[in-house]
Amino acid sequence: MQIKIFPLNCLFLTLLLMSQISLAVDAGDQLNQIERSQNKKERLRSPPKIEEEKEPPKLKTQAATFKVSNFSFEGNKLISSNELQVFLKEYLNREITLDELKLAVDSLSVLYKDKGYLATASLPKQDITEGNVKIIIIEAKFGGTQLKLDPNTKYRIHPEIIQKFIEHSNQKGEVLNLNALDRAVLIADELPGAAVTQSLQSGTKDGETDSLLNINNEPNYVAMVSVDNYGSHATGPVRYQANASFLSPLGIGDRIDLGLLHSKGTDYARLSFNRPIGYSGLRMGINASALKYDVIAGAALSLNPEGTAETLQMEGNYPVYRSRAFDLSLASFLERKHFRNKAQEAVESNYFIDLFNMGSSLNHKNTLFLAGETSASIDVDLGYANYDDSPLTFQASKIEQATQGRFNRLRWGINNTQFFTDTISSVLKFNGQLSDSNLDSSQKFYLGGANGVRAYPTSEGSGSEGYLFSAELHKELTANFTATGFYDYGFARQYIDNTNNATGAENATGKNSFNMKGYGASLEWIGFVGSYRSTFSAIWSRRIHNNPNPQADGSDSDGSRPGNFYWFKASMSF
């Protein structure tokens, strides 16, 4: 038997190349790239509308006047007489007209509404010549919900289910809480498959108010197909995507989402299901995804790098507060990710990442300038990286780089859209993450790409910590076009602990901390192709200064040396 022995320099070169592959292109990086594009928030395209309560106008009249020295109240339980007296103090001990007195009485209903209640105030027949005025207050009670249904319509969600959402936090015969009622209606309206509005009407009993619900069906499904060049050079920049959502197929406010993605070197699929739990607004669900990649370009192509990734996640979401102008939600998920990477058909790595997440998000509409909206989120991740099933050489490298074991991560995102006129708006974004440990590629923060610093390729510039800031100015043009100018800035810190545990040398091959920045412009068209809503966008971007963390030959991680970057995307909705 003949035994062939490779020269040591060839063996060293092969191991070095395989090590570089694991850092540059692997299943964790590819999955992270896809999940980043999926989580992008669509830009607000029109000013948000906020319902504002307007105070009744002050009356000016020359009618006979009289002086009120004291108000007394009857029927008030939710607001004390002292508080009502203070509210009406501007009408005390001065000459007022009868119309002004009526205005004062009517304003009490505004006070109640500001506190989330419905009440009517009236003046009974009385002698007010002594300056004592008695006001009768009727505090509304909830009489229940009434359904306004079309007998010829088969509703996507059983109307009785929607009715239970309203009555869950609004008990019949109890004091009508407008805030609780509004929250329940908004939650019901968010159920997939139904559009819910309400109006208040007099109940069957004196002092009661009913909620009249108007329910309309939404489509059975919504779908979108798209093509873009947002992918990486190594696995094919041109990506084809198809996404479909099936709204309430079980008739209970449930939702099924299916997503598919294909490029020359990548295939990805994701399936999710979620449904309401009870009638408080709590939703829970489960989702799974699978990824397969093959490197089709780049210096490492001869090693035939390939790999897979699978994820399984259980999630929950609860609306803590809902109103027309402000939302606050809590969310949590538990997930497992499994990654396998090969080079020259040999297993390079086989490992798991387990993650427990707790997060909160809010959304606030404002009336600054024309109008605006701010959304923010914060997430805490507790994770564990388990490389025990990987080859010993890979395990050793992860121990040396201190990425094995437990890690904690804090992530945040802030997005503000402000409308100055009907056609001019700005968008400010700031998001990032902090970590207490060196992270695996699947958990890192990436700077480059169409959703990051747009002057750099996808997945360029990654770190265990980092942040991105972008500022955009949008101008609506004629013929459904929008022009945008933007500036992007990103910072990344590759390793929290930059000292190799085995050698004492630095883990980072270049700079451990660096920033990337660029500017550019885009043009977007939104309209209809036939009866299908469609979009097309083109982005041009140019970097400010050179790549701060280039390859040895001065190129980007994908081998390119672009002076300008161009991104394209086209989509069609069904």
State where each predicted segment sits.
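Residues that define the transmembrane beta-barrel architecture of outer-membrane proteins
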Residues: G207, G236-Y240, G265-A269, T308-L312, ...
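Transmembrane beta-strand segments of outer-membrane beta-barrel domains in Gram-negative
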Residues: R283-S437, Y495, N515, D556-S557
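Periplasmic polypeptide-binding modules associated with outer-membrane biogenesis and secretion
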Residues: A24-G231, G259-Y268, L410, K429-G432
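C-terminal transmembrane beta-barrel domains of outer membrane proteins
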Residues: K398-F574
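Outer-membrane beta-barrel proteins
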Residues: G231, F246-L250, S272-Y279, E315-S323, ...
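Transmembrane beta-strand segments that form the barrel wall of outer-membrane beta-barrel proteins
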Residues: Y221-G231, A242-S248, I252-K264, L271, ...
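Membrane-embedded beta-strands of outer-membrane beta-barrel proteins
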Residues: S211, A242-A244, L271-F273, M314, ...
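Repeated loop/turn-to-beta-strand initiation elements of outer-membrane beta-barrel proteins
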Residues: V196, Y221-A223, L250-I256, Y279-G285, ...
